[in-house]
């Protein structure tokens, strides 16, 4: 498996325009190959922090999101588009790892998380602020551009627009998180299926089982909506109620498929 050396750093927010730039072909990539992608030294600190703060099923969901993101990157994610700034594979992976592993800190039920002054905000903002406070530690060696992209992507990962520009980091966390929570139909029939091979999904789900993610996601989102009726995910078409109804309980790809 060979990844492109660079990718488009920014993408159209409009989903159809994004798809037009991509060259997706869902080739099978083994989880073993994805595990072999090098990570920056700071990833361990984010892994341990997310494991401590995020509820277990949400944490395992975050791990799956990272590997889904890598598979999508390998299968035709926009790269080398004329006039678009490029980001190296190594740099993008660094940002995507921290974003994915930390993106649901706002689901926390820990005393530390619930005592945080941001706990009454929409969970994406609450989690983004906690991620910022964690990532700005000097020993993690993230500059302002890296930190800004990671935190902004966490804060906006449930938001979609038809105009403007998003970073590739934000696009990947949105794609992978909605794939894991809603399944292959999240962006319409055949869309996510064009980006990632079902066997790759199956291997990731087998290694990192979804457990009761569906129930935990519903509980986290409904609890957040009671505390913050203006929560960001409430802007999903049809509102929070419509989103909650389509959350998956079953594996995305059944083990026998």
Task: State what each model feature region is.
Residues 92-199:
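Divalent metal-dependent catalytic cores for phosphoryl transfer on phosphate-bearing substrates
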Residues 62, 66-69, 73, 127, ...:
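Buried hydrophobic packing segments
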Residues 1-30, 55-56, 70-90, 159-257:
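Divalent metal-dependent phosphate-bond-processing catalytic cores, especially two-metal-ion Mg2+/Mn2+ enzymes
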Residues 44-66, 106-113:
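Active-site flanking loop/helix segments enriched in acidic
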Residues 54, 116-120, 227:
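Alpha-helix N-cap/helix-initiation motif
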């Amino acid at each position: 498996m060979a990844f492109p050396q660079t990718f488009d750093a920014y993408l159209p927010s409009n989903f159809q325009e994004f798809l037009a730039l991509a060259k997706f072909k869902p080739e099978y990539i083994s989880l073993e190959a994805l595990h072999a992608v090098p990570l920056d030294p700071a990833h361990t600190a984010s892994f341990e922090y997310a494991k401590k703060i995020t509820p277990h099923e949400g944490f395992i969901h975050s791990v799956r999101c990272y590997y889904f993101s890598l598979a999508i990157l390998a299968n035709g994610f926009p790269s080398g588009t004329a006039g678009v700034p490029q980001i190296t594979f190594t740099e993008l992976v660094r940002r995507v790892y921290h974003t994915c592993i930390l993106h649901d800190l706002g689901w926390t039920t820990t005393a530390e998380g619930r005592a945080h002054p941001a706990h009454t905000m929409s969970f994406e903002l609450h989690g983004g602020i906690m991620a910022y406070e964690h990532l700005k530690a000097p020993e993690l060696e993230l500059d302002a551009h890296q930190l800004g992209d990671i935190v902004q992507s966490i804060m906006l990962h449930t938001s979609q627009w038809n105009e403007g520009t998003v970073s590739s980091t934000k696009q990947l966390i949105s794609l992978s998180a909605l794939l894991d929570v809603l399944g292959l139909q999240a962006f319409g029939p055949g869309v996510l299926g064009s980006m990632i091979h079902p066997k790759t999904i199956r291997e990731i789900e087998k290694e990192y089982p979804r457990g009761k993610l569906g129930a935990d996601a519903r509980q986290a989102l409904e609890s957040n909506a009671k505390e913050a009726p203006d929560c960001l995910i409430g802007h999903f078409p049809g509102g929070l109620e419509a989103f909650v109804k389509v959350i998956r309980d079953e594996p995305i790809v059944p083990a026998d498929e």
